[in-house]
Amino acid sequence: MLRTLVTFLLLALASVAFAEDGARSEFTDSRDGRVYRTVEIGGQVWFAENLAYAAKGSFCYGGAAKGCSERLYPKDVAEKACPAGWRLPSNDDFQKLYGYAGKTGVRSVGNALKAKSGWDRNGNGFDDFGFDAKPAGYCESRKKCEYRDCFLSMWSSTENISWSLYCVDEDFNKGTYSKTAALSVRCIKE
């Protein structure tokens, strides 16, 4: 009982301590009129959802050219996909997000960034900061896609580096992919 109370109090204090972060807003992409939710985390302003702009060379999970709410991008397309005033985050940007989200010490970074719903295998998170990371899968090629409801990997601008969340893992992991793999994009404000 005491342990539960202490955990609850720590969560409440963490929520208050980080209340000034998590400032939410919206951004309208002038290229297609789509409105994106944004959130400030640790002094950085991020899209609070995956990019869905239909840049040439991007595609929907499974290879379709259109008709989806989010898209996957090979590395060369990802590097130019964010709208004016926004950019593909660097490895340093992701490291800063990781460090900030890990400061609470109450739960894992992955669970703090994952959305509260949408993940298979009981992989939902707590979305402590409004990042709202939802699974989108990835594609090794246009027709070879996997893990739609269990995996999110986001390109960084740093050579072949991506950051990923898994439904069966509570961390936020740095990894590498071939430049031809198609991953999600989260834009960060310049």
Where are these regions (language model features)?
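Sec-dependent N-terminal signal peptides
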Residues: 4-13
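NAD-dependent ADP-ribosyltransferases
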Residues: 1
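Conserved positions within compact, well-structured domain cores
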Residues: 20-190
